[in-house]
A protein has these predicted regions:
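Short, small/polar residue-rich loop motifs at catalytic or cofactor-binding pockets
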Residues: 3, 151-152, 174
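Acidic/His/Gly-enriched intrinsically disordered linker/tail segments
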Residues: 1-140
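Multi-bladed beta-propeller domains
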Residues: 126-152, 181-191
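Beta-strand C-termini and the immediately following turn/loop, strongest in propeller blades
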Residues: 147, 159-160, 165-172, 182
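A short loop-to-beta-strand structural motif that recurs across blades of beta-propeller domains
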Residues: 177-179
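Flexible, glycine-rich phosphate/dinucleotide-binding loops
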Residues: 23, 174, 187
C-alpha cells in the first residue's frame, strides 16, 4: 500500500506477512497478544486512530506492529485469507490513501472503523474471561519492583550466592547502564 497509510497498516501488514510466509513471526508468538490483552484489561485498548501514534508509554513503538498485525489476523480469520490481496489492491488503487474505511468495505464488506470497534469489544471480553478463569485457579502473585529509574531492566543475573542482582538498565534518556544491586533491588550502583 501507499506510504501515506497509518503505521498500523504498513507495519501490521509487514508483521502479518512475516508470520504468514514463515513458520515463525510475531503473530504466532504471545507478546503481541499480551500487549493487547493488558491494554484491554486496563481500559486502554486503543482506537483505530490511536494505534498509529507514537508514545513514550508502554508499549511504545510496538503498538503499530501489535495492533496492526493482530487486527489483520482478526479480519482474515473472520472474512478469509483471500481478502488480503483485495485489501492491498483497494488501498493501492486509491488516489487518496487515507480512505481506509472505503478499502475495508470493498475488500471485507465492512468499514475498518466499525470492525475495529467490534474487535476491541471482542478483545475486552476475551481478556476479561481469561482473567476470571485465571483468578479462579488461585491468587496470582503480585510483581515486585526490583529496578528504579528504568524503562527496561534487561538480562538480569543473580549471583551464585543469591545476594546480588546485576542487570542492564535503560531509561530512554541516556546510554544503557550495567547496574549491580542487592537481590531485593536495594543499594543500586552503576558499574
Amino acid at each position: 500500500p501507499a506510504s501515506a497509510v497509518p503505521r498500523w497498516v504498513s507495519e501490521g501488514l509487514a508483521t502479518w506477512y512475516e508470520s504468514e510466509l514463515t513458520d515463525a513471526g510475531r503473530v504466532r508468538g504471545t507478546y503481541h497478544d499480551m500487549v493487547l490483552r493488558t491494554a484491554a484489561l486496563e481500559g486502554r485498548f486503543e482506537s483505530i486512530g490511536q494505534a498509529a501514534g507514537g508514545s513514550p508509554q508502554w508499549p511504545e513503538g510496538t503498538r503499530a506492529y501489535a495492533y496492526g498485525s493482530l487486527f489483520f489476523e482478526h479480519l482474515l480469520d473472520k472474512y478469509g485469507d483471500e481478502r488480503m490481496d483485495q485489501f492491498i489492491e483497494a488501498v493501492a488503487g486509491q488516489w487518496i490513501p487515507y480512505r481506509l474505511d472505503a478499502a475495508g468495505r470493498s475488500s471485507f464488506g465492512v468499514s475498518l472503523s466499525d470492525e475495529w470497534a467490534a474487535w476491541a469489544d471482542q478483545a475486552r471480553s476475551e481478556a476479561e474471561g481469561l482473567d476470571s478463569e485465571l483468578a479462579s485457579l488461585g491468587a496470582i502473585s503480585a510483581p515486585e519492583r526490583l529496578t528504579n529509574n528504568a524503562r527496561w531492566g534487561l538480562h538480569p543475573k543473580v549471583s551464585t550466592d543469591g545476594s546480588a542482582l546485576v542487570y542492564v538498565r535503560s531509561n530512554a534518556k541516556s546510554d544503557q547502564q550495567l547496574v549491580l544491586a542487592n537481590a531485593d533491588g536495594s543499594e543500586e550502583r552503576t558499574l
